[in-house]
Design a protein with these regions (language model features):
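Conserved beta-strand scaffold positions in the cores of enzyme catalytic domains, especially
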Residues: 34-36, 97, 126, 169-171
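Generic beta-sheet signal
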Residues: 9-10, 37, 100, 120, ...
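Short beta->alpha connector loops
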Residues: 13-14, 130-132, 150-152
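A contiguous loop/helix-start segment that scaffolds small-molecule binding in enzyme catalytic cores
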Residues: 64, 138-206
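Short gly/pro/ser/thr-enriched loop/turn and capping motifs at secondary-structure boundaries
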Residues: 14-16, 42, 104-107, 153, ...
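Class I SAM-dependent methyltransferase SAM-binding "motif I" and its flanking Rossmann-like core
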Residues: 75-140, 190, 204-206
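Class I S-adenosyl-L-methionine
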Residues: 2-96, 183-184, 188-189, 197-198, ...
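Short, structured patches in soluble enzyme cores that scaffold and shape functional sites
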Residues: 38, 73, 128-130, 148-149, ...
Length: 206
């Protein structure tokens, strides 16, 4: 980040750039050119693709001028990351790209809970927001990670209860932020939880 003269940062409709704010606490970014990038929160693949192309359109002139661009991202760029799709679009256009690993959100959540994500010989399953068949997912062996569960917290908690997993599952919302909330169990939850809520579900046989 400090080596690149230009920083690309996702921006919400309200103007917030959370990933940039976090990065500013870890690196000296004074004097950088900041490119705010807006992305539609849509399940329509065509709408999302248009957003990634628009972001690449904003970044490409900087690269053409010989200026390296770093795009900040929440979590790790290889895991359900908007930044990766922008990178992929730029790569298709012939630009050199590089991925820098970050701390995956679910790894940070596991650390906040003091839990391991894996056990010997058992798999780890990672599910994005709105996974189509949560009941089938919860029946799988091993630990389950349910990412960005805040919008469907009621449905998630109900599914965990049906499988007898609510007491042993845990959740962290806004992990690492001043607004962080830790829930050691998935019972008695408030009606509204931050979108950035990750649930850790232990192996169903435990």
């Amino acid at each position: 980040l400090e080596a690149c003269p230009v920083i690309a940062a996702p921006q919400t409709a309200s103007g917030e750039m959370l990933a940039l704010s976090i990065a500013q606490g870890a690196a000296e970014l004074g004097g950088k050119t900041v490119l705010p990038l807006s992305f539609a929160m849509s399940r329509d693949a065509a709408v999302r693709a248009a957003g990634y192309a628009h972001a690449a359109d904003a970044i490409a002139p900087e690269l053409d001028a010989g200026r390296n661009v770093a795009m900040v991202n929440l979590g790790d760029v290889s895991i359900y990351a908007t930044a990766y799709y922008v990178l992929d679009e730029l790569r298709r256009r012939g630009y050199d790209t590089r991925m820098v690993p970050g701390v995956a959100s679910f790894s940070a959540v596991a650390a906040a809970l003091g839990r391991s994500l894996t056990e010997m010989e058992l798999p780890l399953h990672i599910y994005p927001a709105g996974a189509s068949d949560l009941d089938a997912a919860l029946a799988q062996p091993g630990t389950k990670v349910l990412m960005k569960s805040g919008k469907a917290i009621g449905e998630t908690a109900a599914a965990l209860s049906r499988h007898g997993l609510a007491e042993d599952s845990a959740m962290v919302a806004d992990c690492g932020l001043p607004t962080q909330q830790v829930f050691e169990t998935m019972t008695g939850l408030p009606e509204k939880i931050s979108y950035f809520a990750t649930v850790i579900v232990p192996d169903s046989k435990k």
